[in-house]
Amino acid sequence: MQYICKKNKMTNLIVGTVAFDAIETPYGKTDKIVGGAATYISLAASFFTEKLNLVSVVGGDFPKSAIKMLHDHNVDTAGLQIKESEKTFFWSGRYHNNMNSRDTLETQLNVLETFDPIVPKQFSDSDFLMLGNLVPSVQQKVLDQMTKKPKLIVLDTMNFWMDHFLD
């Protein structure tokens, strides 16, 4: 595939959910599919950036083929923790007609409930940091591990964290 723009060489650290999703829209419905903010941030960014670093956690039920897909997009998964005896985070939601609003139908935290992000040393000086949809205390732990202030920090959140972990 030929790119319209040249990929930048800056490093990007992406921390967030690598998960399973089940999604309903007015146009269709999926069962359990590979999802998660960090998954899709990584895949989208891979078209514009050469160096992508991922920190997340999955259970032993997460498909190796999905991890290979990340590798195929030059995503370094040295920071991906795999907890073999546990289940991967799962989210289910229904999107409304305008596709801007949605209702959460189910959230199973699973491995995310005890996720302690460990930023590998080689990731700690990344130029950009994308903190995906995670509990704010986990996002703060990532910030505390950065050895160099990123040029840009992007933060995502969701009503679940605000409703349950506002402290």
Question: Each PLM stretch: what is its role?
Answer:
Residues 21-32, 49-130, 144-150:
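Conserved N-terminal subdomain of the carbohydrate kinase-like
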